[in-house]
C-alpha cells in the first residue's frame, strides 16, 4: 500500500492505510447460514403436484406485436449485461468496467456484496433507448445526465447512455440554450448551435454511477453531497497493470485533445468541454453556499443531472479536501461531521463545532483549495516484478427475447412506467418464451398491479422452475398465507400442518437466496404463530438467523420473542426484548415490548 503527498502536483513518497472508516459505509458481515431443519414439517410441497395452467395474454387492438429488438447479453460477477451497442464497443466498455470493479475491491475491500439477484447493467448504444428509462419527473429537455441508477428493494439497474457523445447544456454556468439531439449512430456526436456542450465519457459515467449505486444501498444512507464527492473521486481513479491511484486531480492548465487539435489547425471555435476535476471546473465559477450544497437531496435535479454542474464539482472539492487535503489532516474532523449527520441535521452550528469554521470561512477554504490543491494521494502498488490481478474474459452473445423483455421490463417498472414494462415482458411471453426468470418477473409485475389471479399462476410456475428471485417466493408465500388465513383448516383459526408447509416452503427457498429479506423472516414467524404445530428450537433457529441479519427490524425482533415465549425459551425472549427496547424509535413499539416483558415470569 503506497501513497503520494502532492504539492502543486509534484509527487513524493509516503505511506498511508487506505481505509473508509465511516460507520454508515461499514458493511455488516452476516453470520453463517443455519441449516434448515424440516422436523415434523418435512413434507412435500403439495403445490408441486398440481398441474399449472399459465394465463393467456390477448392482443385486442389492431397493432401488431413490436418486432424483436437485437440486444447482446452477458454476465459478470454481480451483473447481467444487456447492450444494444456494437459487440466490440460493449466488450470494451464492460472489460474496462471489470478492471475498475477489481481495482475497487483492492482499495475498498468489502464494499461490493454478492447477491442472487444480479444488478442489470443496460448499455444503450443506439435508437435513443436511454431516454425511455428516465423516470417521470426527471425528464428534461436539457438533461445533464448520461447514466442513472434505478432501485427498489433488492432489485436494481444501472443504465448507461453510450450513444450520446456530447450533451448540449443550458446551465447556470453560462451555456447558451440549445436542444439536445442524440446522434442516430452509435459513435455519432451531438452538437447544437451556439453551445459546444459537454463531452460524455461513458466509461467515467459508469464508474460514477456504480459508486453511487453502492453507496445508495448502504443504511443509513449518507448525504447526497458525500455520495457525489466520493463518486467523483473514484471516477478519476487511475488503474494500470501495476498501480491504482485514488484521489489524484488533474493539472488545471491542460486542454482537451480536441481543443488542442483545433488550435493547432488554426481553426477558431471551442471544442466540447470535458467533465473535468474540481480544480479546473470551479476555477472561474461562483461557489454555492455551504447550506445550498448540503440541501441537495439524492433525487434533486442537481444530483441527477450532475454532468458539468457546480454542485457536483463543489461536492467533489469538499469531500476531497476532507479526505486528502493538506496531507489528510482534516480527516478526523470530516469523519466526525459525517458520523454526526447520521443522527442530526446539517447546521452551521454543527459545522463550526466539527471544523472550527463558519460556512463562509469554508467557502474561502474551498476557493483556496481549488486554486492550490495540496493533498495526499492513496493507492495500491504491485510488488516488484508483479502485476495487479486481471479480470476474466467477458463472454457476449445475442440475448433471447425473454432476457430482453425481463431486463428491460424490470428497469422500466423501476422507472415507474408500468405500461411499458408490461409490454416489454409480455411480448416475449406471447411469442412463447417461458424462461423461469421471465415468469417470476411477470408474476411480480402482476402482483404489484393487484392482479393476484395472474400473479399466483406465474409465481407458482416460477417457483416450480426454481427461479432465482427471493422476492418471487416471498410474494407467493404471502398469497398462500392469505389463502390459509381466509380458510384455516384447524380450530381457533389455526393453520394445519399442510397449510403451514405450503407457506413455509417458498419462504425457506427464499432464505437460501441472497440478498436476505427481512419480510421473509417476519412471515416465517407469523406462519408459526398461526400454525397448529408448536415449532421446535431448531425451527426457531431460522428466526434467530433473521434477527442477526436485521437486528433493527423491530417487528421481526418482537415476533421472534413471542415465539421464544411460546416454546418456553424465556431467557432468549428477555434478550430479544432488551434488543427491541434499545432499537425501537416509536412509543407504541416500545410499549409492545414492555407489555411482553411484563408478561414473563419473574427471573430466578
Give the predicted meaning of each segment.
Residues 45-59, 66-230, 234-241, 296, ...:
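Juxtacatalytic substrate-recognition/specificity segment
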Residues 46-48, 306, 340-488, 495, ...:
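Beta/coil-rich, acidic/histidine-enriched accessory regions frequently appended to metallopeptidases
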Residues 67, 142-159, 187, 201, ...:
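Acidic/His/Gly-enriched intrinsically disordered linker/tail segments
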Residues 424, 458, 496-499, 503-506, ...:
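Alpha-helical solenoid repeat scaffolds, predominantly canonical TPR units
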Residues 428, 461-462, 507-510, 545-546, ...:
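Canonical positions in the second alpha-helix
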Residues 431, 465, 513-514, 549, ...:
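Structural marker of alpha-solenoid helical repeat scaffolds
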Residues 444, 478-485, 492-497, 508-545:
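Alpha-helical adaptor scaffolds
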Residues 499, 571-587:
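TPR/TPR-like (Sel1-like) alpha-helical repeat modules
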Amino acid at each position: 500500500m503506497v501513497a503520494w503527498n502532492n504539492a502543486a502536483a509534484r509527487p513524493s513518497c509516503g505511506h498511508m492505510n487506505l481505509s473508509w472508516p465511516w460507520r454508515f459505509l461499514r458493511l455488516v458481515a452476516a453470520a453463517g447460514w443455519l441449516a434448515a431443519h424440516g422436523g415434523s414439517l418435512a413434507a412435500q410441497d403439495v403445490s408441486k403436484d398440481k398441474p399449472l395452467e399459465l394465463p393467456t395474454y390477448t392482443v385486442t387492438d389492431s397493432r401488431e406485436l413490436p418486432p424483436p429488438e437485437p440486444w447482446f447479453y452477458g454476465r459478470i460477477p454481480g451483473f447481467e449485461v444487456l447492450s444494444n451497442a456494437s459487440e466490440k464497443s460493449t466488450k470494451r466498455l464492460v472489460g474496462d468496467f471489470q478492471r475498475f470493479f477489481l481495482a475497487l475491491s483492492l482499495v475498498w475491500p468489502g464494499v461490493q456484496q454478492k447477491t442472487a439477484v444480479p444488478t442489470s447493467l443496460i448499455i444503450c448504444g443506439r435508437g435513443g433507448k436511454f431516454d425511455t428509462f428516465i423516470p417521470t419527473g426527471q425528464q428534461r429537455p436539457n438533461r445533464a445526465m448520461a447514466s442513472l441508477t434505478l432501485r427498489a428493494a433488492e432489485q436494481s439497474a444501472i443504465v448507461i447512455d453510450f450513444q450520446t457523445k456530447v450533451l448540449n447544456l443550458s446551465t447556470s454556468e453560462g451555456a447558451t440554450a440549445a436542444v439536445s439531439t442524440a446522434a442516430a449512430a452509435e459513435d455519432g456526436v451531438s452538437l447544437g448551435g451556439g453551445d459546444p456542450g459537454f463531452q460524455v465519457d461513458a466509461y467515467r459515467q459508469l464508474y460514477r454511477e456504480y459508486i453511487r449505486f453502492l453507496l445508495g444501498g448502504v443504511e443509513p444512507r449518507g448525504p447526497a453531497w458525500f455520495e457525489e464527492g466520493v463518486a467523483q473521486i473514484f471516477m478519476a481513479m487511475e488503474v494500470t497493470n501495476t498501480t491504482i491511484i485514488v484521489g489524484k486531480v488533474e493539472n488545471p492548465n491542460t486542454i482537451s485533445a480536441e481543443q488542442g487539435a483545433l488550435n493547432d489547425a488554426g481553426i477558431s471555435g471551442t471544442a466540447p468541454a470535458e467533465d473535468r476535476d474540481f480544480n479546473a471546473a470551479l476555477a472561474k465559477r461562483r461557489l454555492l453556499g455551504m447550506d445550498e450544497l448540503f440541501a441537495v437531496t439524492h433525487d434533486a435535479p442537481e444530483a441527477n443531472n450532475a454532468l458539468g454542474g457546480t454542485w457536483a464539482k463543489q461536492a467533489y472539492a469538499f469531500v476531497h479536501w476532507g479526505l486528502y487535503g493538506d496531507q489528510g489532516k482534516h480527516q478526523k474532523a470530516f469523519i466526525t461531521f459525517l458520523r454526526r449527520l447520521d443522527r442530526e441535521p446539517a447546521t452551521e452550528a454543527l459545522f463550526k463545532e466539527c471544523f472550527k469554521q463558519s460556512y463562509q470561512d469554508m467557502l474561502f477554504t474551498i476557493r483556496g483549495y481549488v486554486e492550490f490543491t495540496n493533498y495526499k494521494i492513496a493507492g495500491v502498488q504491485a510488488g516488484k516484478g508483479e502485476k495487479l490481478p486481471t479480470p476474466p474474459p467477458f463472454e457476449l452473445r445475442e440475448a433471447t427475447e425473454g432476457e430482453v423483455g425481463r431486463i428491460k421490463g424490470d428497469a422500466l417498472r423501476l422507472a415507474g412506467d408500468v405500461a411499458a414494462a408490461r409490454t416489454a415482458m409480455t411480448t416475449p411471453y406471447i411469442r412463447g418464451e417461458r424462461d423461469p426468470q421471465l415468469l417470476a418477473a411477470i408474476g411480480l409485475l402482476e402482483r404489484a398491479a393487484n392482479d393476484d389471479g395472474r400473479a399466483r399462476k406465474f409465481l407458482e410456475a416460477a417457483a416450480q422452475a426454481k427461479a432465482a428471485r427471493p422476492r418471487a417466493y416471498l410474494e407467493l408465500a404471502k398469497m398462500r398465507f392469505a389463502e390459509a388465513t381466509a380458510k384455516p383448516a384447524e380450530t381457533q383459526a389455526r393453520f394445519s400442518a399442510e397449510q403451514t408447509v405450503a407457506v413455509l416452503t417458498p419462504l425457506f427457498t427464499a432464505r437460501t437466496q441472497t440478498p436476505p429479506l427481512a419480510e421473509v423472516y417476519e412471515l416465517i414467524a407469523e406462519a408459526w404463530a398461526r400454525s397448529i404445530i408448536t415449532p421446535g428450537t431448531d425451527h426457531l433457529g431460522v428466526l434467530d438467523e433473521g434477527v442477526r441479519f436485521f437486528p433493527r427490524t423491530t417487528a421481526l425482533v418482537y415476533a421472534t420473542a413471542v415465539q421464544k415465549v411460546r416454546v418456553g425459551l424465556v431467557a432468549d425472549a428477555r434478550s430479544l426484548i432488551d434488543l427491541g427496547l434499545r432499537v425501537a424509535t416509536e412509543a407504541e413499539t416500545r410499549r409492545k415490548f414492555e407489555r411482553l416483558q411484563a408478561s414473563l415470569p419473574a427471573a430466578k
